[in-house]
């Protein structure tokens, strides 16, 4: 399986560096943004699987990026984890309503974040494997549809002989 790409969107230099280093150590490809506009540009141009995003960033907040993302026509929309110091119930609700998939308050426990990302990565990789299997089945059905009944019968005979 290919390593997933994680976008870290954080304006605070130290926080961003810690998250970037962690993402790379955990075995994921890294994309990085210093503000919401840069995050949006990366989301438009790169295939991002998971996005770890601060709420309060210059030029465009994490919540604004979430709203834009959910309203966009992107082929691939990433799993979004908002990481923020906003810890009031109404903030958490607003984050989810904006389109965040997950919400973690600062200070961020890296062990917890790693577990969340690993869980999401596992789910995404299983979904991708299922999609690939479905595509393979569809290609096989198209191939079979182009065969004559005699070709299908002979193919079935060959398969039965292999099993015995």
Regions found by a protein language model. Name each.
Residues 12-31:
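Two-component/phosphorelay signaling modules centered on CheY-like receiver
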Residues 57, 69:
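Receiver (REC) domain active-site loop signature in two-component systems and cognate sites
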Residues 108-117:
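C-terminal output helix
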